Amino acid sequence: MRINISLSSLFERLSKLSSRSIAITCGVVLASAIAFPIIRRDYQTFLEVGPSYAPQNFRGYIIVCVLSLFRQEQKGLAIYDRLPEKRRWLADLPFREGTRPSITSHIIQRQRTQLVDQEFATRELIDKVIPRVQARHTDKTFLSTSKFEFHAKAIFLLPSIPINDPLNIPSHDTVRRTKREIAHMHDYHDCTLHLALAAQDGKEVLKKGWGQRHPLAGPGVPGPPTEWTFLYAPRNEEEARVVEMIVEASIGYMTNDPAGKIVENAK
């Protein structure tokens, strides 16, 4: 009886609604039914990428979704020729073998495919690449926790080096926007990297298939500078050497090493 009364009451209320109100109500219910599974899957993907600058909860997911409204194109090369820096610190790279890996759709960049072998990562990459490269530049850099990825170890420009003089550090705007951060590796997750590259070096990296720009990197966007680049995880020792070359070039650009000092091999 109680169920019948409740249903009767519901039908009575619906009968008093206008056709427009009923259509709107049905539309909202239908849209919610369609959107909920999509949002649920997307939220699960957000959690699977692991720790980042966003909290690992629904609040962090909302932050990421809002920032995604500012997403930029990530693989075009023309943008680099519009930047003032024309020097290079990186030698010509070989083409990366195979196709590009699939990347998460969020602004938190992580690889979904072509994942690195865990044994190789433990032996050659995790807590090794970033410290090893930085150890060759202790006069200008230091290691600390990333300003972008709070679980990653990063290379920074020393605080004692001034960055407000373009004659001293031509990359001063890039250095300022990254808060002196040069490079970090997500070695707690998939061993991909983020780092700052001179425009022509970034162009070389993208052209040869080794990475892509950060989705928020670009002029007029509330994010990292255009030079902020995402590198795919190295899958073997040869690719690891190329990645170290690229990190070396990043340090050369951000510390204003002589432009003629082209990085060809990690030593």
Curated annotation (Swiss-Prot):
How does this chain sit within the bilayer?
A: Single-pass membrane protein
E.C. number(s) listed in UniProt:
1.-.-.-
Recount the biotech application: The availability of a complete eukaryotic luciferin biosynthesis pathway provides several applications in biomedicine and bioengineering.
Enumerate the UniProt keywords alphabetically: Glycoprotein, Membrane, Oxidoreductase, Transmembrane, Transmembrane helix
Activity sensitivity to pH = Optimum pH is 8.0.
Q: Which residues cross the membrane?
A: 17-39
Q: Primary place of residence?
A: membrane
What does UniProt give as GO cellular component?
membrane
> A GO molecular function for this record?
oxidoreductase activity
Concerning InterPro entries, the annotation shows:
Luciferase, Luciferase_dom
Please state which protein family the record places this protein in: Belongs to the fungal luciferase family.
What is known about what this protein does?
Answer: Luciferase; part of the gene cluster that mediates the fungal bioluminescence cycle. Uses the fungal luciferin 3-hydroxyhispidin as a substrate to produce an endoperoxide as a high-energy intermediate with decomposition that yields oxyluciferin (also known as caffeoylpyruvate) and light emission. The fungal bioluminescence cycle begins with the hispidin synthetase that catalyzes the formation of hispidin which is further hydroxylated by the hispidin-3-hydroxylase, yielding the fungal luciferin 3-hydroxyhispidin.
Question: Any idea what this protein is called?
Answer: Luciferase
Q: Which organism is it from?
A: Neonothopanus nambi
Organism placement in taxonomy: Eukaryota, Fungi, Dikarya, Basidiomycota, Agaricomycotina
Give the gene name.
luz
